Structures are given as structure tokens and as C-alpha cells.
Amino acid sequence: MADPRDKALQDYRKKLLEHKEIDGRLKELREQLKELTKQYEKSENDLKALQSVGQIVGEVLKQLTEEKFIVKATNGPRYVVGCRRQLDKSKLKPGTRVALDMTTLTIMRYLPREVDPLVYNMSHEDPGNVSYSEIGGLSEQIRELREVIELPLTNPELFQRVGIIPPKGCLLYGPPGTGKTLLARAVASQLDCNFLKVVSSSIVDKYIGESARLIREMFNYARDHQPCIIFMDEIDAIGGRRFSEGTSADREIQRTLMELLNQMDGFDTLHRVKMIMATNRPDTLDPALLRPGRLDRKIHIDLPNEQARLDILKIHAGPITKHGEIDYEAIVKLSDGFNGADLGNVCTEAGMFAIRADHDFVVQEDFMKAVRKVADSKKLESKLDYKPV
């Protein structure tokens, strides 16, 4: 009697294992079926999109009646057309870009404002993930910058309660390598808002009027995507002092500056658009650009003192693989007159000395050699006297 029972038990176990195996395969096939269904639906949608009729891009010129509008198609002619019932007609103001039906020319939907490719590239500049803790020796400057840029965007009711108008922008000025661009990147990465990174020299165009048009489009984009921060680096490229004599190129740069002044403080207010400008030549800037109402606060970022240099050096030396005790105070004592970029270069040179010695780590002697080497190269630099603006 025992043998048939054992045989039946073995058969049961065998069938149970087969059942589990088939059940596992069934689950895999169900997952595959879901994935294939998704791919099928995506292919169907793509096919419908390819088979659908295109639409004409137009621009609203004038509203005639409650239902009729004059629009101008991109290919030239003007039409009196109707509008879909679902669309909010109050948004169809003159200048609005719309999509028109191919056959009836009915306004089907709104289109966003046309953006210049240069402005689009500015808006997609990644500021990186920079925190305020990564900026050493500039605690006072960080506080002043956050009061002007961050506070009006995050807590505008504070200004309303006090009864003052929030500042529009600020100017960061000081010697090269002191962290002006790094400060702007930190503000942009800490705030959840749009960020336009503008290199001022790239705005200047060889064709008359193109530079001013780019400034207009830049500010229009910022107003459409509020809250927005516009960071203009090396502003002295277009913000130089105006003079009567000069070539046609100089006059074109002056026209660009006048457009910038108008956009910053014209009739069309900026609301939640903030300006940060940076330069290492504040003495060359036009007085109209520096007045309150355009750049309300001027933040001087000077060369770091001994304590600030120590903080900056520790930040730069943080990721480096070190061996033994590192005397940062001794290194800082040899770095008189260094800026933040120079201290970063000291860490890089120390790493290069370690590689030259076939080490996987940096020791105190490498830092001492590096700081002496950077100090020797600093003697070649010319010095500017930065007076308060």
C-alpha cells in the first residue's frame, strides 16, 4: 500500500512543480502582452497623427464681432474667420498666434509666442546643482543677493505689508575669479523658476536692429514664463558709457543698451522677472544702467580675506583624496591676494604634483608646492582698483 501512495505523492509534486512553472510563464506572457499592447497603442496614435490633416499658422490682427476675427496667414493673405466654441475669445488679442483649419480657416487653438532660437538656448542653460554651502567667504553677499532676488519671488507679501516696491535687480562687481557667476548659479539652482543665462557679447549682431530685437524677445520670453531670473554676464560688453563720437558698430551697441534700459524700466513692468548682472569693469558702465529702479543694489565681491580663503580652500579640497594631516592654515598664509579660482587651482596643481610622484593621494607637501607655483604665476597679472559703485 505504501508504494502507490509514494508514487501518487511524487506525481502530485511533479504536477505541482509543472503548474508553478506554467504559472510563472503565464505571468511573463501577460507582462509581454501589456508591453506589446502599449507599443500597439503608441503605433496607432503615431499613425493617426501622420494621417491627420495639418493646420495653418496665423496671427490675430483684429476682432470684428463676437464671433469673427481678422487673421493673417503666414503665407501672406488676410481672412475673416470664425472661432471654435470651446476657445476663450478673450485670449484672442491682436498679435496672438493661432492654428487655422486647412479647409474652413476656423481658429482651432492658441499657439505659444514664437521664440528666437538664441533665447530658447539661453533658457535651456543648466545652472547645475550649486548650493550656498559650496560658496565660501561670501555669507554677507549671499544674504544681500537673496534679499533682492529670492525674497520678492518667494514671499512677495512681505513687501506688500511694508508698502514698498520689490527691487528689480542687482549688479555683482569685483575682480575676476571671486565667485560672481557662481553666486548667480546658486540662486538659480535653489529657486524653482525659469533661468535665462545671457552672455552679453553674444547679443551683439552685425545687422542693425537685430541686437535690440533679441533683447525684446528675451524680456518677452521672461514675462511669459514668470517667475524668471535673467542673468547677464560681462554686462560691460553692451552696457558701456555712451558717447557722441564713434563708429556705426558703437552706435549699434548704444541702441542695444537703450533697448535694455527701456525693457528694464519702461511702461511694461517686469512683475516677477528679476535681473542679475555681473562685471569686473564697473567703472565703464553707463550711469543710466546703474540707477535705482533698474539695478537697485550693487554688491561688491572683493578678494577673500584669510578666514574666507580658509573656507574656500576647504570646500575645494573636500573631494580630494588626502593622506596624513593637512595644515590648511599654513597653506592659506602663503595665499595672500588669491581669489576663489586661484584656490581651486591650488588644489588642481596639488593633484598634478601627486600624479607626477605616482601617488593616489595628496599630501601636505603637494599643497605647499602648488600654492608657491600659483603665487609665482599671480605676479604676471595686472591689478585694477575697484571703487564702490
From Swiss-Prot:
Q: Which UniProt keywords apply?
A: Acetylation, ATP-binding, Cytoplasm, Nucleotide-binding, Nucleus, Phosphoprotein, Proteasome
Xref: PROSITE patterns: AAA
N6-acetyllysine sites (modified residues): 72, 206
This protein's record includes keyword Aminoacyl-tRNA synthetase: no
Family annotation (InterPro entries): 26S_Proteasome_ATPase, AAA+_ATPase, AAA_lid_3, ATPase_AAA_core, ATPase_AAA_CS, NA-bd_OB-fold, P-loop_NTPase, Prot_ATP_ID_OB_2nd
Q: One cellular component GO annotation, for this chain's record?
A: proteasome accessory complex
So where does ATP get bound?
174-181
Instruction: Kindly give the SMART domains that the UniProt entry links to this protein.
Output: AAA
Q: How does it assemble?
A: Component of the 19S proteasome regulatory particle complex. The 26S proteasome consists of a 20S core particle (CP) and two 19S regulatory subunits (RP). The regulatory particle is made of a lid composed of 9 subunits, a base containing 6 ATPases including PSMC6 and few additional components. Interacts with PAAF1.
Q: Give the record's GO biological process terms.
A: ERAD pathway; positive regulation of RNA polymerase II transcription preinitiation complex assembly; proteasome-mediated ubiquitin-dependent protein catabolic process
Q: What does this protein do?
A: Component of the 26S proteasome, a multiprotein complex involved in the ATP-dependent degradation of ubiquitinated proteins. This complex plays a key role in the maintenance of protein homeostasis by removing misfolded or damaged proteins, which could impair cellular functions, and by removing proteins whose functions are no longer required. Therefore, the proteasome participates in numerous cellular processes, including cell cycle progression, apoptosis, or DNA damage repair.
UniProt cross-references to Pfam families, sorted A to Z: AAA, AAA_lid_3, Prot_ATP_ID_OB_C
Q: Name one GO molecular function term.
A: ATP binding
The listed locations are:
Cytoplasm; Nucleus
What is the name listed in the Swiss-Prot or TrEMBL entry for this protein? 26S proteasome regulatory subunit 10B
Question: What SUPFAM superfamilies does the annotation carry?
Answer: P-loop containing nucleoside triphosphate hydrolases (SSF52540)
Gene3D superfamilies from the UniProt entry: 1.10.8.60, Nucleic acid-binding proteins (2.40.50.140), P-loop containing nucleotide triphosphate hydrolases (3.40.50.300)
Q: Which residues carry this modification: Phosphoserine?
A: 244
Q: Do you know which PANTHER family this protein is assigned to?
A: 26S PROTEASOME REGULATORY SUBUNIT (PTHR23073)
Family to which the UniProt record says this protein belongs = Belongs to the AAA ATPase family.
Q: What is its main location?
A: cytoplasm
What species does this protein belong to? Bos taurus (Bovine)
